[in-house]
């Protein structure tokens, strides 16, 4: 499944403090001075809403990556704010979507099966079949286009359901791979992953037959590959 873990290395200006002043030579300020009236006035004059969730998320990130004795500046804060949406949720830089950040708080809740569009299941089925045949059953992370399928799904889902949708699609992907594996073995009992698959071995496997009687919630337990 494709999801994104928070990167504490987001870029914004930090400089070590070598003096006692709260503002350095290039107009930056110590993070400990963020809530001072002078810095708040500068932020508001620059068009930054210091009451917004977007701003608060950016400041939280800055504080977690540095400390009060380090420096930041207005442009750095603006740049960091662009990584968050109006709700203060991290925006993935690859697909421009929020709601895909795995945190300690949502690690458990994201692992649930929800309803996802048939079009996404069909897209995953077709890609899994194509790659299974091309790679002779090998799960090749270097050549797969799975990320595209997951990103297409995420765009169809509401922000709050994106992680769970990805988790659900991963289960269907496992079901499809297992169905193709079983069909290849049925066509040639001596077949092994990495060896050429017998022509037509997967022709009888449709998405409907692959899913028949299978529960996505049990996919991890039932699948062998």
Listing of model-derived features with the role each one plays in the protein:
Residues 1-225:
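Type III/flagellar secretion export determinants
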């Amino acid at each position: 499944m494709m999801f994104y873990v928070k990167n504490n290395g987001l870029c914004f200006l930090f400089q070590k403090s070598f003096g006692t002043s709260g503002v350095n030579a290039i107009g930056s300020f110590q993070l400990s001075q963020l809530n001072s009236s002078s810095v708040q006035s500068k932020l508001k004059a620059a068009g930054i809403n210091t009451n917004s969730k977007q701003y608060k998320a950016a400041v939280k990130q800055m504080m977690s990556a540095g400390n009060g004795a380090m420096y930041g500046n207005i442009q750095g804060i603006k740049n960091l704010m662009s990584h968050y949406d109006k709700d203060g949720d991290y925006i993935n830089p690859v697909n421009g979507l929020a709601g895909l950040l795995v945190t300690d708080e949502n690690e458990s809740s994201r692992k649930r099966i929800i309803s996802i569009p048939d079009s996404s299941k069909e897209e995953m089925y077709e890609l899994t079949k194509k790659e299974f045949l091309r790679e002779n059953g090998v799960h090749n992370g270097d050549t797969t286009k799975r990320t595209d399928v997951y990103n297409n799904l995420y765009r169809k889902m509401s922000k709050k359901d994106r992680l769970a949708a990805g988790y659900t699609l991963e289960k269907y992907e496992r079901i499809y791979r297992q169905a193709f594996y079983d069909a290849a073995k049925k066509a040639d009992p001596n077949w092994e992953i990495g060896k050429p698959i017998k022509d037509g071995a997967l022709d009888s496997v449709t998405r409907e037959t692959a899913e028949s009687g299978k529960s996505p919630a049990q996919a991890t337990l039932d699948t062998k590959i």
